[in-house]
């Protein structure tokens, strides 16, 4: 059996062919312009036309995803996918079985299937990028919530909200790599497009005062979220993903800041699969669905 896997993002579509034991035998990616949902659908059709020997389709998608019906009630940055049933569309186009799951849940399922969560019953995954996402595995099961919105950790408040536009006090608005770059651009008077997270952290290592202040605030925001999650879910482990985790000293620095919060005994580590987590988690969900229907 070969499974076509898709990991849908607002700026890129990752595609692959994966075997049932988790070996990825082919990968491809496409840049997505302006979160264009129609372009995503066209790229998926093209990939499937190029790989006619696949026998199923596994999808990792952003937003609020009903994995039972395939309906995406809110597509995140991809507004074309609001109230769109991607599972039904793919099945009609190909005649193949399709399984779809939320992207953050797929990252968690990859960790459960072929990562550090294989023997764990209570753990969380937290992803730090342009936004903050997450997945919850509690009492031996993935937690999706009554409306498939569980794990939207980025909507937690990072500080006491003001009366006007309280959403600007959430982790998504205060503690992401995009926010860090915007803050640095504002303070230095440089264009945002010229600034990378790598540059800011390099300046932090060189003891640049602006970078030190911003990154200390960045870590404090992450620790605030972790503190809340630890006391909400009592996980034994939290695995963190996102480009920031490629920094060798990230976990050490995070734990240093976390010490003042009272870390307790929760183990915090980086996630295993990096950019392949979405593809692998989608395939694991597909295999679970196939087994359930047999």
Curated annotation (Swiss-Prot):
Protein name per its UniProtKB record: Beta-glucoside kinase
SUPFAM superfamilies in the cross-refs: Actin-like ATPase domain
Gene3D superfamilies membership: 3.30.420.40
Organism, as annotated: Listeria innocua serovar 6a (strain ATCC BAA-680 / CLIP 11262)
GO MF: ATP binding; beta-glucoside kinase activity
Catalytic activity: D-cellobiose + ATP = 6-phospho-beta-D-glucosyl-(1->4)-D-glucose + ADP + H(+)
Superkingdom assignment: Bacteria
Enzyme class, first EC level, given as a word: transferase
Gene (UniProt): bglK
InterPro entries attached to this UniProt entry: ATPase_NBD (IPR043129), ROK (IPR000600)
Keyword Cytoplasm applies: no
Record EC number: 2.7.1.85
Main function: Catalyzes the ATP-dependent phosphorylation of cellobiose to produce cellobiose-6'-P. May have a dual role of kinase and transcriptional regulator of the cellobiose-PTS operon.
Family the entry assigns: Belongs to the ROK (NagC/XylR) family.
UniProt KW keywords: ATP-binding, Carbohydrate metabolism, Kinase, Nucleotide-binding, Transferase
PANTHER family assigned to the protein according to its UniProt record, in alphabetical order: BETA-GLUCOSIDE KINASE (PTHR18964:SF165), ROK (REPRESSOR, ORF, KINASE) FAMILY (PTHR18964)
């Amino acid at each position: 059996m070969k499974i076509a896997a898709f990991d849908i993002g607002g700026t890129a579509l990752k595609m692959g062919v994966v075997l049932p034991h988790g070996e990825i035998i082919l990968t491809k990616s496409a840049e997505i312009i302006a979160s264009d949902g129609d372009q995503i659908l066209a790229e998926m059709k093209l990939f499937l036309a190029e790989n006619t020997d696949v026998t199923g389709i596994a999808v990792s998608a952003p937003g609020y995803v009903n994995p039972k019906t395939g309906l995406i009630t809110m597509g995140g940055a991809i507004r074309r996918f609001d109230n769109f049933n991607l599972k039904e569309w793919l099945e009609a186009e190909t005649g193949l079985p399709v399984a779809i799951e939320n992207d953050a849940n797929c990252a968690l399922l990859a960790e459960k299937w072929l990562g550090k969560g294989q023997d764990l019953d209570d753990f969380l995954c937290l992803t730090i990028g342009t936004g903050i996402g997450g997945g919850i595995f509690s009492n031996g099961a993935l937690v999706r919530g009554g409306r498939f919105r569980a794990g939207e950790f980025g909507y937690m408040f990072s500080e006491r909200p003001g009366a006007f536009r309280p959403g600007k006090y959430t982790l998504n608005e205060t503690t992401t790599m995009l926010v860090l770059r915007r803050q640095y651009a504002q303070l230095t008077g440089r264009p945002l497009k010229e600034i990378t997270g790598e540059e800011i952290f390099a300046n932090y290592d060189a003891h640049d005062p602006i970078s030190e202040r911003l990154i200390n605030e960045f870590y404090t925001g992450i620790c605030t979220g972790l503190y809340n999650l630890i006391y909400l879910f009592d996980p034994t482990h939290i695995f963190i993903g996102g480009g920031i985790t490629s920094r060798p000293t990230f976990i050490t620095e995070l734990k240093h800041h976390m010490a003042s919060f009272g870390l307790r005994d929760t183990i915090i580590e980086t996630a295993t699969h990096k950019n392949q987590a979405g593809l692998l988690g989608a395939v694991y969900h597909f295999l679970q669905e196939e087994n359930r229907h047999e």
